[in-house]
């Protein structure tokens, strides 16, 4: 068994989508090691005992995250009401990295071409665009010139019965796409197709992913939630060839 971490590390001051609140801010909590060590006493095996905690301020759309239907429509379900069963289970990886480029949109034909004949889509579909290669090296370009789906691609995935779509880009819609069609078709219709954005490491996955998880925190009134996305593989599947920096 091999576990593949598909989430970006959350750090104070990290780059973020220009339309979302600033990156995480870590504030001093109510406990600090120096102060608690003065009154917690000692343990015979571990010496001086101390504890620390902190307060973290962050957006529901920080780093690798899942969009709740509320993100795209008034009076829609929030992050606390995301169906966990839709975001956990077997997944299909569609490698569309040959189209990788600034503001490129992936259409239904591209998705169909990435699916071998005779293969059916799993309820969870992961889109490997290779755009995440510049997440750390050129974050401004990563966020402002990202890739996304066309409307017909979103309709194709919904018609196939997909319940969750993940992408290694900051948004399921490219920044120049009017009307945000992928968000609308996925999040404003029932049942919703949950959207996981800012994935990484998809180049390490095979076509058939035995187990994928991206569980949201049950945050009431939030339009999204950071997730610790990961895949569990039965064995080392080998790797896709990593694309050059877009």
Which residues fall in each region the model found?
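Active-/binding-site microenvironments in catalytic and ligand-binding cores
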Residues: 1-246
